[in-house]
A protein has these predicted regions:
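Walker A/P-loop
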Residues: 64-115
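Canonical AAA+ ATPase core
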Residues: 95, 130-133, 155-163, 168-246, ...
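C-terminal engagement/docking regions of AAA+ P-loop ATPases
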Residues: 3-5, 12, 21-26, 81-85, ...
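Conserved C-terminal "switch" segment of AAA+ ATPases
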Residues: 25-36, 49-50, 200, 214-289, ...
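Conserved beta-strand position immediately N-terminal to the Walker
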Residues: 70, 148, 186
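Pre-Walker A (pre-P-loop) alpha-helix and adjacent loop at the N terminus of AAA/AAA+ ATPase modules
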Residues: 32-75
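Conserved alpha-helical scaffold flanking the Walker A/P-loop in AAA+ ATPase domains
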Residues: 59-62, 129-149
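Walker B catalytic acidic pair
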Residues: 74, 151-152, 163
């Protein structure tokens, strides 16, 4: 074989490799396409009730399907309750779901208004004495729901916050030395008002780390705000809302399908680890992100890839979600104003290496 032939063969191999990296997304399986349809129906159900918040709705649904939780920083009247309620009521439970009767106390949506005088039992529930039967029985608290809105979570005591921490991390609550399990779909949307810090208890780092995303909500666009005023009556119509609902089992099945079928290559994991290590070593960073944050991010990347019509995680998914995942986890040194600049610098080399890798 001549040198010219060898060179030409190498060039063709390089071209083929480059074509493979830039090719159209691999076709999704029938099961993955069904999972995508479940996510789209769920998204559409929420969008009919919450206008002008498409980006926030997408992140919230990603967190739900990825088995994470969301922290919203917002102002009063921004639609957080409507969003959480719409999501909870879009998920329905049939009698077939409740084979063992364990879902009897689970409701679609609960709102917990956190105050300084709130007790852990006000959240988790507690033992109540039944005089007729002469024994105690457990009264389920508002935390037993598919979707829980923890409103102004930073206004309650650390003791109540720790009760929430157990529920969010372990999907269970402990009352009087007895453990009660929450639903597999248990999902928390917590809020805090960044403008009013009087009488608050800042969330400790371990609890902040339990939230997959921290989302800062802004005022919606002018046209969307007009749509809200024009359609507020129709959006309250329960008949219209019933047409767009998703079964609880469908959401859980979609979660399982996405976990099994969306590929996360070694190159993606390597990039995440290298970015994290760059952040921890950067002199502008006082505290980097934990390994757990990367573990929590993996299923979120899979869900986003599914929403984008792919069966594998790409560099684009990392660029989209990483700022959302790290925004509340990375502590900058005094005088460093922008995390985005630090993150961009720390991502540059790992993402350049990722661009040369095969992802599926």
């Amino acid at each position: 074989m001549t040198l010219e032939a060898t060179s030409e063969e190498s060039r063709l191999e390089d071209d083929a490799s480059q074509t493979d990296r830039s090719a159209a997304p691999a076709a999704q399986s029938a099961a993955l396409q069904h999972a995508l349809s479940v996510l789209r129906r769920l998204s559409e159900a929420v969008k009919r009730q919450v206008l002008g918040r498409d980006d926030v709705i997408e992140l919230v649904i990603i967190a739900l399907v990825a088995d994470g939780h969301v922290l919203l920083e917002d102002f009063p009247g921004s639609g957080k309750t409507t969003l959480a309620k719409a999501l909870g009521e879009a998920i329905v439970t049939s009698n077939e779901d409740d084979v063992d009767g364990s879902l009897g106390a689970i409701v679609p949506f609960r709102r917990i208004q956190f105050t300084p005088d709130l007790l852990p039992s006000d959240v988790t529930g507690g033992s109540v004495f039944d005089a007729n039967a002469n024994h105690f029985h457990f009264r389920h608290g508002p935390i037993f729901a598919h979707v829980v809105l923890a409103d102004e979570i930073n206004r309650t005591s650390p003791k109540v916050q720790s009760a929430m921490l157990e529920a969010m991390g372990e999907k269970q609550v402990t009352v009087d030395n007895a453990t009660y399990h929450l639903d597999k779909l248990f999902f928390v949307i917590a809020t805090q008002n960044p403008l009013d810090l009087v009488g608050t208890y800042p969330l400790p780092t371990p609890q902040l780390d339990r939230f997959l995303f921290k989302i800062t909500m802004q005022h919606i666009e002018r046209d969307a705000e007009l749509d809200v005023l024009d359609s507020y009556k129709s959006r309250r119509d329960p008949v219209a809302a019933d047409k767009l609902q998703v079964a609880r089992t469908e959401v859980l099945k979609a979660r399982e399908t996405i976990d099994q079928e969306v590929v996360i290559s070694t190159a993606i994991k390597t990039a995440l680890v290298d970015i994290s290590r760059n952040l921890r070593a950067d002199e502008r960073v006082l505290q980097g992100n934990s390994t757990r944050s990367m573990v929590l991010m993996l299923p979120a990347l899979q869900v986003l890839a599914t929403l984008r019509g792919r069966s594998f995680v790409s560099a684009e998914d990392i660029e989209t979600l990483l700022p959302r995942v790290l925004g509340h986890r990375v502590e900058l040194a005094p005088g460093v104003a922008e995390l985005s600049r630090v993150l961009k610098d720390c991502m540059r080399e790992p993402m350049e290496q990722l661009a040369r890798a095969t992802l599926r």
